[in-house]
Design a protein with these regions (language model features):
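ATP/NTP-dependent adenylation/nucleotidyl-transfer catalytic domains that generate, transfer
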Residues: 6, 18, 23, 163, ...
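Enzyme catalytic cores with a strong preference for nitrogen-chemistry domains
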Residues: 1-350, 366-375, 402, 407
Length: 638
């Protein structure tokens, strides 16, 4: 439960129709198995103690009593387990029979939720046996306990206040206004569905979309426990399709036609953060709800869910290709609109032979293609300086030739040396003045050429550099339109690789692949004696894949340093140890706060993803905020 994670499961135990004792034994085994795996919530199928397909036997008192006896068995088992179990059974209340889900927790029946929507079409005949859930909540006597009975029950964990549980049953999800919507608005972050959904062609995909879609709309965790193979009888076949989703993402599911358990962890801190940042999410309104507290032991949850080390980059190759193409299209469309709006005949860009300027150039030629303008209207300027290597310069020249843009070469060496004389700086002192003078000279050259050409300067800096402040103020920090400003470095690599993989020109692909293999560097310090790059960015500020990971979890979900560290240790296990991660995490927070003043005056640029640092949109932070709280937390983690 530390860091907001709660391990949960949805399962389809083996079942025999109308054999309540057998069903209870199998469910009890599943409870033991679930608890042994460290889970604190188990959701079982609809009418799982009797079987959903009992038909008119459901009206038989013998079967109803058998269900109560089975419930007592599970209740006794629950007394010894740190586990909340939700199981389905028919229950007679005040002369009416209800299709119910009982919530069991350590020997207590916390509540009983009756089904609201009873399907009575096609193969379903529930209205033949059951009564829809009554309005309001009442108290019933059940197995010697006084138990809340109603749909509007909210089960709240004392030790983890963000963990609030509510229940609906099968068809309740499939209707126009599911009860789970009301439950989520009342504050529920985890929604459980006891279901008996028979299998027909195409239904599995539809069911999956319902579960993931509802979890996305409600910014919630959603557990769907489906009736398994034992329910298959007469005209219906059941597959036991168990699903667990979190905010639109499917975290776990079972294969069809198995009696398996889906098990994973939900991050209720993340869900709560998502609701807080979405200001259109209603204020929790639990009026009319019965709030039922329960307790769980506080312990660290062993995570089995995948922690993506590259959260900005889709892991699936097909999705990644589609994402890359969509991003390139968005970047190009943003620049196209800017050029069209100001009637600008030319775009000017500094081309270094590095990743960022390569991506910006690829975007710029797309924008010109969209405008129906010749690519020669794109003026790419290579500006060799004291640290420029033959490799990067050659790559820049070949790239421009293959893309058909106008290439200009302006050496900045003489101008910078004159500037050093003017300000009294010794050229042998390769300090920050030495470096930044070159960056600002390059920007001045670009701005002046843009004036000559009646054009605008296209910025190349990426999101990762902006987060770390790894840009010279009023140097590469500045442009008229920054196309890469919301693209993190890890994603820049994949975008350039996508361009290489999909282009028809072998020579162009070859130069793009070589650019991908070139170390990231601003090339502001003299090269090594053998002509290779001496100044390597990741040696100085740390691996970009780590910083992008930190950035994503800090900005997107507001994770504190200790949680980011925990997630990073899992995501990068075997690649970076705790000491290295802590070192660069400290660097990240220190630089992120110190360098906000640069982000407070960024040029325009297209928003591409959910994490961006534009001061006019997604990130509004004072330039002089203290980082003491965050660094102090990191000190405590040594």
């Amino acid at each position: 439960m530390k860091y907001g994670f709660i391990k949960v499961a949805a399962a389809s135990p083996a079942l025999r129709v109308a054999d309540c004792r057998y069903n209870a034994e199998r469910a009890a085994e599943m409870m033991q198995q679930t608890a042994a795996a460290g889970a604190h919530l188990l959701v079982l199928p609809e009418l799982g103690l009797t079987g959903y397909t009992c038909g008119d036997l459901l009206l038989q008192p013998t079967l109803q009593q058998g269900a109560l006896t089975a419930l007592q068995t599970l209740l006794s088992v629950s007394a010894e387990l740190p586990l909340t179990t939700i199981t389905g059974l028919p229950l007679s209340v005040e002369g009416k029979l209800y299709n119910c889900a009982a919530v069991l927790h350590q020997g207590q029946i916390l509540g009983v939720v009756p089904k609201t929507n009873l399907p009575n079409y096609s193969e379903f005949y529930e209205a033949r046996w059951f009564t829809p859930a009554p309005a309001g909540t009442r108290t019933i006597s059940l197995l010697g306990q006084e138990v809340p009975f109603g749909t509007d029950l909210l089960f709240c964990c004392r030790e983890l206040p963000e963990y609030k549980l509510a229940v609906e049953i099968c068809e309740d999800l499939w209707v126009a206004a599911p009860p789970s919507t009301r439950h989520a608005i009342a504050g529920a972050t985890v929604l459980a569905n006891c279901s008996a959904s028979d299998e027909t062609i195409g239904k599995a995909e539809y069911r999956r979309s319902l579960v993931t879609g509802q979890s996305a709309r409600l910014m919630a965790g959603y557990l769907y426990a489906d009736a398994g193979r034992g329910e298959s009888t007469t005209d219906m076949v059941f597959a036991g399709h168990n699903l667990i989703a979190e905010n639109g993402k499917l975290l776990a599911q079972t294969a069809l036609f198995t009696n398996e358990m889906a098990i994973t962890e939900l991050d209720v801190y993340r869900l709560a953060a998502e609701r807080r940042r979405t200001t259109t999410w209603p204020t929790a309104e639990a009026a009319g709800y019965t709030v039922i507290p329960f307790s769980l032991p506080v312990s660290e949850t062993s995570l089995t869910r995948f922690i993506d080390p590259h959260p900005f980059v889709p892991a699936d190759s097909t999705e990644r290709r589609e994402r890359c193409e969509a991003i390139l299209a968005m970047q190009a469309e943003g620049l196209r609109r800017r050029l069209e709006h100001i009637g600008c005949p030319t775009a000017v860009l500094g081309i270094s032979g590095g990743l960022d300027s390569t991506l910006a150039l690829l975007v710029a030629v797309r924008a010109l293609d969209l405008l129906g303008r010749p690519r020669t209207d794109m003026v790419a300027v290579t500006m060799p300086g004291f640290g420029t290597t033959s490799r990067t310069r050659s790559n820049a020249e070949i790239l421009c030739e293959k893309l058909g843009v106008t290439l200009r070469t302006v050496s900045i060496a003489a101008a910078v040396r004159q500037h050093f004389q003017d300000i009294g700086h010794d050229e042998k002192v390769t300090d920050v003045t030495y470096e930044n003078a070159q960056a600002r000279e390059r920007t001045q050259v670009l701005m002046d050429i843009a004036n000559q050409q009646n054009g605008i300067v296209v910025g190349t800096g990426d999101l990762s550099e902006l987060a770390l402040g790894w840009a010279t103020y009023n140097g590469d920090h500045m442009s008229m339109y920054g196309v890469n400003g919301s693209i993190p470095k890890t994603l820049v690599r994949y975008l350039v690789r996508h361009a290489a993989d999909t282009c028809d020109d072998e020579a162009l692909a070859a130069v793009l692949y070589d650019i991908l293999d070139t170390p990231v560097s601003p090339e502001l310090l003299p090269a090594e004696e053998d002509g290779t790059i001496a100044q390597k960015t990741e040696d100085l500020v740390g691996p970009y894949e780590l910083h992008d990971f930190f950035l994503y979890h800090f900005i997107r979900y507001g994770c504190p340093p200790r949680k980011i560290l925990h997630l990073a240790e899992l995501a990068f296990a075997g690649r970076y140890d705790r000491t290295a991660i802590l070192k660069w995490l400290r660097t990240f927070f220190r630089r992120f706060f110190q360098q906000q003043f640069k982000r407070s005056c960024l040029p325009d640029g297209p928003k591409v993803g959910s994490v961006t640092l534009s001061p006019r949109g997604d990130w509004r932070m004072p330039s002089d905020a203290s980082t003491a709280l965050w660094l102090r937390e990191l000190e405590d983690l040594q």
